[in-house]
Amino acid sequence: MSTRRTTLALCATATLMLGSACHSNTPPVIVAPPPLSDSAAAALRWVNAHAVPFTIPDSMHPVTDRMPIMDFVGNARVLGVSELTEGTHQFAGIMQSILATLSSRGFRGLAIQAPMAETMEIDRYVRTGTGDPKRWLRALGLHWNTQEIFTLVQWVREYDRSRGPAEQIGFYGFEIPNAAHALQVITTLPDSVAGAGFNAFVRRQIQCVTTGESAAWGREGPASDSTFWNRCRAATASVVDSLGALQSRLAGRSSAQAMVAFAQQMARVAQHDADVGLRRLPRHETVAEHILWLASLAGSDGNLLVWGRDVESGRLTGEGNVVQSAVPVAKTLGDRYRNLAFTVGEGVVRAQPINVGQREPGGETDMRLRPPRVGSYEDMLDRASGEALFIDMRTLGTDTASTWLKGPRSARLVSGIYSENPIGSFETPLQFPTYYDGLLFVKHGTPATPLRR
């Protein structure tokens, strides 16, 4: 709890104690929300008739309870979910439940919006038990360093423990700010495993990735030369092949083979980085290429669940003409891309506070959400029946309720920072099913818990 909120709580407690000496206890005054417009009331009736309630996993409700989304997902190759309201306890459990449900439908990977190479360390852990997942969740940043994400990682580990590689669920990151960690893994194999000569060869071949990443794009030099990148693609491919051959030569040395296999996986990341770098794509197309590449790791029949922060998984262009990666992903996959938005009606989230006069947000704390804006999706959904709802928006028609639900209409957008004071909108306009095929709504959010060391 923040100092400001603690002070307010103490003042409120003192006031109540003084008041109780002179007056009898009176029930708190609950201010009813403004009545819905006729069209919003029609939308509420539609939601109550069509929404499907679901159970969020917790100690009382195991993850074996299935999410009601199989028909919605259909033959989708990629399911993207936008975490519009970040910092809740509930969302990681919902993603865990979705993954458990869709594992029987060939979903073989979860990709989060985090650095790819570092997240590969968590992938190695869930598949083999090697490594320290808490260390790597810390490395991914505050958003991922929570008890809820750790619980999700442990669930994937237990799922994978008794399954072969083809049936396991992978844990990936779909951003590559740089390939530094991948290169470190590739170039630090012990000489006792790879040999000094082999390691020297690998370091020479892979150096081009570092050169390309450190160069200034659009200026004179190798990074502006397609010939350089073509050579780099060939060099990284030779490293991948050489590590595969080394792994074969290490037959009978299981620990050494596992070490080399992981280095080969990191070499594939570097190879993919070089391949995408050659094409000099804008950010949204680059990220889309990462997502589609991760989907390919699951095989021709494998599918991928994508956890996008804020509106990343939406088919939309935001402020400043910022195009989201889901736009090119959907263009490539067509109806084999499905997506959902997640939002919360009220409650408390974990976020970094920002207030008037602050140039930078403060450290993370628990923050109470402001009441929903009148006319917003949350304002209407807060009055729906049920605590947690899944709504398939693809069935909207042309009646009054459907017109209201289609939008554009505002929804919460809490992306790492927030203010309990009335500054900033912390909202984004949505349209259904143009931006999202469906919606996941939780009426009362509670804050995520920082991961204990």
Which residue stretches match the model-derived regions?
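Bacterial N-terminal signal peptides
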Residues: 10-20
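Structured catalytic-domain cores with a bias toward divalent-metal coordination
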Residues: 22-453
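Bacterial N-terminal signal peptides that target proteins for export
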Residues: 1-11
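Short intrinsically disordered, low-complexity coil segments enriched in acidic
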Residues: 2-3, 18, 25
